[in-house]
């Protein structure tokens, strides 16, 4: 009997436990289970999880996509955490620390934690690795999974490529082996733990700006300029934090940025579109119907940039629109009116 079997109560080895049963967490669980691996999916809402188990589908977020037989729906957190050595945390960034605290009492001695959460710590703008270290100490290997991924396309088995990074090289290799488990889901290894976390947060903010630009009606030229200069801002902040420049030309940087800024499956882009069309922040968020990570990310990235002394004019203007009531058109005008300078 394997080590995994000794720890779980399912009578069969569990390859991975996914913590978080929203659209992205569910899609990752489906993708992992589709190739025959036993995958546990845990969510905090017992009624929601009961529907998932009864329907063998997540009709709320991923209608029409059936669960593989090897996907195990679980409501008992202790059973879920102890079922597998490897945990994949897929929750909104503002509850990331809370969720880790709930996991901590149930962790195995050999547990390893990867997250696909994109964002920074609320109110501080700290990287999620710092939150994880505060909660868990240095006892467990940590990793981050990031890249251009829409939940529906992943769950449907459409071709997707992402990256995984960790200070623990063996953990990266193991995750790459476990997640890169089909002909349509490719996983690249990355050594830049900091850059991988940062890209996922900043791209959400720039996507709001791209949506605002399109909502106003500025067109493709303006959208492309925002993406390009947004990448420059992401890279400057990354350099200040010690990230590797090439990370931002990869899946977790340019890849995720282009995806989120150009396709209306992106909640952040749709949120920006609504703002550009004149809706207020509260109405725009309500109309989306799901968490708009970029709203909180904007404040977090803005705080981090201020703390690091990094100039991020696009982030600055989006922050003023979201948190200070500035008109989106005026924000665009102020960006265009900035002093002439060298491109860098």
UniProtKB/Swiss-Prot annotation:
Known catalytic reactions:
sn-glycerol 3-phosphate + NAD(+) = dihydroxyacetone phosphate + NADH + H(+); sn-glycerol 3-phosphate + NADP(+) = dihydroxyacetone phosphate + NADPH + H(+)
Q: Where in the cell is it found?
A: Cytoplasm
Tell me one GO biological process term. Answer: glycerophospholipid biosynthetic process
- UniProt xrefs under SUPFAM superfamilies: 6-phosphogluconate dehydrogenase C-terminal domain-like, NAD(P)-binding Rossmann-fold domains
Q: What main location does UniProt list?
A: cytoplasm
The protein's annotated pathway: Membrane lipid metabolism; glycerophospholipid metabolism
Task: Give the GO molecular function terms.
Answer: glycerol-3-phosphate dehydrogenase [NAD(P)+] activity; NAD binding
Instruction: Give the binding site residues for sn-glycerol 3-phosphate.
Output: 118, 147, 149, 203, 256, 266-268
**Would you tell me the Gene Ontology cellular component terms?**
cytosol
Sites binding NADPH sit at 23-24, 44, 118, 151, 267, 291, 293
In terms of InterPro entries, this protein maps to:
6-PGluconate_DH-like_C_sf (IPR008927), 6PGD_dom2 (IPR013328), G3P_DH_NAD-dep (IPR006168), G3P_DH_NAD-dep_C (IPR006109), G3P_DH_NAD-dep_N (IPR011128), NAD(P)-bd_dom_sf (IPR036291)
Keyword hit for Chaperone: no
Which residues are the active-site ones?
Answer: 203
UniProt keyword annotations, A-Z: Cytoplasm, Lipid biosynthesis, Lipid metabolism, NAD, NADP, Nucleotide-binding, Oxidoreductase, Phospholipid biosynthesis, Phospholipid metabolism
Which Enzyme Commission number(s) are on file for it?
1.1.1.94
Q: What does this chain do? A: Catalyzes the reduction of the glycolytic intermediate dihydroxyacetone phosphate (DHAP) to sn-glycerol 3-phosphate (G3P), the key precursor for phospholipid synthesis.
Q: Which family does it belong to?
A: Belongs to the NAD-dependent glycerol-3-phosphate dehydrogenase family.
Q: Return the protein name.
A: Glycerol-3-phosphate dehydrogenase [NAD(P)+]
User: Could you read off the lineage of the organism from its UniProt record?
Assistant: Bacteria, Pseudomonadati, Pseudomonadota, Gammaproteobacteria, Vibrionales
């Amino acid at each position: 009997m394997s080590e995994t079997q000794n720890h779980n109560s399912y009578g069969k080895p569990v390859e991975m436990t996914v913590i978080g049963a929203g659209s992205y967490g569910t899609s990752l669980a489906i993708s992992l289970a589709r190739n025959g691996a036993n995958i546990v999916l845990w969510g905090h809402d017992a009624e929601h999880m009961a529907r998932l188990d009864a329907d063998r589908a997540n009709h709320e977020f991923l209608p029409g996509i059936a669960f593989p037989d090897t996907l195990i729906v679980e409501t008992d957190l202790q059973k879920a955490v102890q079922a597998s050595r490897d945990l994949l945390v897929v929750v909104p960034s503002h509850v990331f620390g809370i969720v880790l605290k709930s996991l901590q009492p149930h962790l195995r001695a050999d547990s390893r934690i990867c997250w696909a959460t994109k964002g920074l710590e609320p109110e501080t703008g700290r990287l999620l690795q710092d939150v994880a270290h505060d909660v868990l100490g240095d006892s467990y290997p940590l990793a981050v999974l990031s890249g251009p991924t829409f939940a529906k396309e992943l769950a449907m088995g459409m071709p997707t490529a992402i990256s995984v990074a960790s200070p623990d090289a063996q953990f990266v290799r193991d995750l790459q082996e476990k997640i890169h488990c089909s002909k349509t889901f490719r996983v690249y290894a990355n050594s830049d733990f900091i850059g991988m976390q940062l890209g996922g947060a900043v791209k959400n903010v720039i996507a709001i700006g791209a949506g605002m630009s399109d909502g106003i009606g500025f067109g493709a030229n303006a959208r492309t300029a925002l993406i390009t200069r947004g990448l420059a801002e992401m890279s400057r902040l990354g350099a200040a934090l010690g990230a590797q420049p090439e990370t931002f030309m990869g899946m977790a940087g340019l890849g995720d940025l282009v995806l989120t800024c150009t396709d209306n499956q992106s909640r952040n882009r749709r949120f920006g579109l609504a703002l550009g069309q004149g809706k207020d922040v509260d109405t725009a968020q309500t109309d989306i119907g799901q968490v708009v990570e970029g709203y909180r990310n904007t404040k977090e990235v803005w705080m981090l940039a201020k703390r690091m002394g990094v100039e991020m004019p696009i982030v600055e203007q989006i922050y003023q629109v979201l948190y200070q009531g500035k008109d989106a058109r005026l924000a665009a005008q102020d960006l265009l009116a900035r002093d002439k300078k060298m491109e860098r």
